[in-house]
Amino acid sequence: MPLLPALMLAAALAQNAAPPPSAEPEDKAVLAVAQAFFDGMEKASPEAMRATVLPNAQFMGVRKQADGTVKLSRVAFEDSFGKHMDPGVKEWMWSPVIIRRGVLATVTAPYEVSKDGKTLHCGIDVFTLAKADGAWKIASISWTAEPDACPELRKL
């Protein structure tokens, strides 16, 4: 392969590549908490999810309606996932971006959620975590719910 086309191809692929996973131990710890929340969700275990969140953790979902309006749903963990979790739900994320400063961190990533193996929707998750008593805990999770965005988001 001639050198110029190979370099152009490499440059194009690099522009779309996700950032490499962080090697920082604190970043890994932050990401592990978000993953533990997903693991608790998959186990349908409010107790396992509760172990990852701060008291009074808040959740917010954002969904664009068919008429173009935006629906915001806000709920406390204890009033939603903390009460009951349906079995068969699985959520996963990829290409996470972690920003951490002191005792505050965020994890932003595309995600997909399914129930009994069927995709419900994709979107962007934003976890906000705080370090309390030496451990990272989720203070809030915000997300978009975009049923038609999965093909686009899976490319990220």
Positions of PLM-derived features:
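Surface-exposed, charged secondary-structure patches
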Residues: 58, 71-120
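A short, polar/proline- and glycine-enriched secondary-structure boundary/capping micro-motif
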Residues: 117-120, 147-155
